[in-house]
Amino acid sequence: MTSLKVFVIYDTKHGNTKLSAENILQGISDVRGIETSFGYANEIEVERVADYDAIILGAPNHMGRPSRTMKKFVDRLANVDLKTKYVAVFGTYAGKMRPVDRAVRKLEIMVQEKLPNLNLISPGLSVRVNGITGPIVEGELPKCYDFGRKIANILEKQ
């Protein structure tokens, strides 16, 4: 049996989204039989992503929207012949606590519009940070790990 392959791709300005991505990656990696890759959106050749079973995209909230870097990455992905079947998104935000930040919702919509062949396998995760530069609010990182485990468990059943 071939193992599942998941690529966690993030953009970050102050390191908070990267830290969130690392915890999501750990949650996925702790499920046996799933091969993972991890990288910064600006450094990834989009063609590398084509053969993964799932991609997880994470971006900081910039003025209520996903970062420009992540938007450009999704635009580039739209021009690749993806074998990928599944996608999930997450993001970091500052401000009042809310179940799902609006930038995460916008990233979900963007992915569904530009990559219509991908199935959204989980509602997005919003990770709250203190102020613009962080750090991540206490209690948020375990949510990242749990998000990774949840995605891995869903993928195992597909």
Give short role names for the model-derived ranges.
Residues 2-4, 16-19, 27-31, 37-41, ...:
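FMN-binding flavodoxin-like domain, especially the glycine-rich phosphate-binding loop
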Residues 10-14:
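Aromatic-flanked redox-active Cys/Sec active sites in thiol-based oxidoreductases
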Residues 43-45:
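A short, well-ordered alpha-helical element
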